[in-house]
Amino acid sequence: MLSKAHAKVNLSLDVIGKRKDGYHLLKMLMQTIDLYDLIEIKKIKKGIIIDCDREYIPKDRRNLAYKAAELFLDRYNIDSGVRIDITKNIPVAAGLAGGSTDAATVLKIMRDIFRPDISNEELKEIALDIGADVPFCIEGGTALCEGIGEKITPIKNFKNQILVLVKPNFGLSTKDVYNNLKVEKIYIHPNTTKLIQSIEEDNLKSVARNMRNVLENVTLRKYKALNSIKSNFIELGALGSMMSGSGPSVFGLFDDMLKAQICYDNMKEKYKEVFITRTI
């Protein structure tokens, strides 16, 4: 069984506190985009086998797709195993939920193969044990995600909007970015309510104005290239630009495909991983 695993971007990301167990409390507006990996799963007698077209992708428990399959098989006492073939298009360690969406897609395919009676809500319970972005990736679309990612409120779909996406030539560790964030020193928070209102009113310029990611407090200081990319997007006609997730991917929001194409061509001269895509 073959399925697409779509990436996401953050239209906003706020950190509003930290729990005693070390988990950060988040308030994020998440958006699925039409950039995707392909996941194919076949039933086998025993075990979990992962194959991928990129050699650097781990094929053991370090891969969230493996972890998803293992949790599913254990939870439902399934005796057989699975072979998972992954075709990677989403950049890794990029803030685009590449690993999380693969894991979510594995859960959904395995449900179809083994337990079609399972609801999305039940799948999300498993998903939360894998990572904060995985529950959102079960549903996709446009949603407000709160807590540690488990509280998901769908909002009006912000679909068919044009994005140009740049993944710089380095990766970032989500854990390191959050560890270096000082919550008490976040002085400007996203106006998430205003952002949602702007989406509901189809006010693209207001959406662009209200996009904000507090993790940029960490990454923009350390990686000057991210500032340059954001500035380049605005110079090349983007309505707004923001880092997605814990980075380092940066996207520009456009209202014109010609401007987006010119921007893409310009960015492609400097960076290997550049994409034109749309929200879905």
Swiss-Prot record:
Keywords: ATP-binding, Isoprene biosynthesis, Kinase, Nucleotide-binding, Transferase. The keyword NADP does not apply. InterPro entries: GHMP_kinase_C_dom, GHMP_kinase_C_sf, GHMP_kinase_N_dom, IspE, Ribosomal_Su5_D2-typ_SF, Ribsml_uS5_D2-typ_fold_subgr. GO terms for molecular function: 4-(cytidine 5'-diphospho)-2-C-methyl-D-erythritol kinase activity; ATP binding. Its EC number is 2.7.1.148. The active site is at K8, D133. GO terms for biological process: isopentenyl diphosphate biosynthetic process, methylerythritol 4-phosphate pathway; terpenoid biosynthetic process. It is an enzyme of class 2 (transferase). It catalyses: 4-CDP-2-C-methyl-D-erythritol + ATP = 4-CDP-2-C-methyl-D-erythritol 2-phosphate + ADP + H(+). Pathway: Isoprenoid biosynthesis; isopentenyl diphosphate biosynthesis via DXP pathway; isopentenyl diphosphate from 1-deoxy-D-xylulose 5-phosphate: step 3/6. ATP binds at P91, V92, A93, A94, G95, L96, A97, G98, G99, S100, T101. It holds the Pfam family GHMP_kinases_C. Transmembrane segments: none annotated. Catalyzes the phosphorylation of the position 2 hydroxy group of 4-diphosphocytidyl-2C-methyl-D-erythritol. Belongs to the GHMP kinase family. IspE subfamily. HAMAP family: IspE (MF_00061). This is 4-diphosphocytidyl-2-C-methyl-D-erythritol kinase. The gene is ispE.
